[in-house]
């Protein structure tokens, strides 16, 4: 796993009270199932690991994630959408660092979150109350009811990020595509 992602998962998130369980990408389905905890909220991986260059068995990880009622989130930065389309193999959410291949020259800092709209958050309301219950900070909107499965996660991620970051220094450089 990319060093920045590893440090975020093992150090920063730990300080915030979030525990992350790491698994070997070559583990058996049984070992993978054993890594899940009752409070597991998501499974995260990279389509091609950086710097190891190992290719993730997306179908195996998607099947495990879905058996345990969590979305599979994949970082597809290294592979890019030209070489790998994770949704076709079962991923629910795909993230990209657009600063790399998509920008080409690292002239702009950016990222993308792409939601397949297929994960049913409403089947697990206790696990995902931020999407399935009214959000007081946005006039009581319930994201899954208002935006459906295809828009709930990405809308919440976008509006809360914009709210929490505050005014954008150069708004012409921020884009919201839904």
Tell where the protein language model's regions lie, with residue ranges.
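Conserved PLP-enzyme active-site core in the AAT-like
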Residues: 1-178
């Amino acid at each position: 796993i990319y060093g920045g992602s590893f440090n975020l998962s093992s150090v920063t998130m730990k300080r915030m009270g979030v525990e992350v369980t790491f698994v070997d990408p070559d583990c058996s389905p049984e070992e993978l199932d054993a890594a899940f905890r009752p409070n597991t909220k998501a499974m995260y991986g990279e389509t091609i690991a950086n710097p190891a260059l190992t290719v993730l068995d997306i179908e195996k990880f998607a099947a495990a994630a879905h058996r345990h009622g969590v979305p599979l989130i994949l970082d597809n930065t290294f592979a890019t959408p030209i070489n790998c389309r994770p949704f076709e193999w079962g991923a629910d959410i795909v993230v990209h660092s657009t600063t790399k291949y998509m920008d080409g020259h690292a002239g702009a800092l950016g990222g993308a979150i792409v939601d397949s709209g297929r994960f049913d958050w409403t089947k697990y309301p206790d696990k995902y109350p931020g999407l399935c219950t009214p959000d007081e900070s946005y006039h009581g909107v319930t994201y899954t009811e208002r935006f459906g499965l295809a828009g709930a996660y990405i809308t919440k991620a976008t509006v809360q990020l914009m709210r929490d970051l505050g005014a954008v220094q150069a708004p012409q450089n921020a884009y919201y595509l839904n």
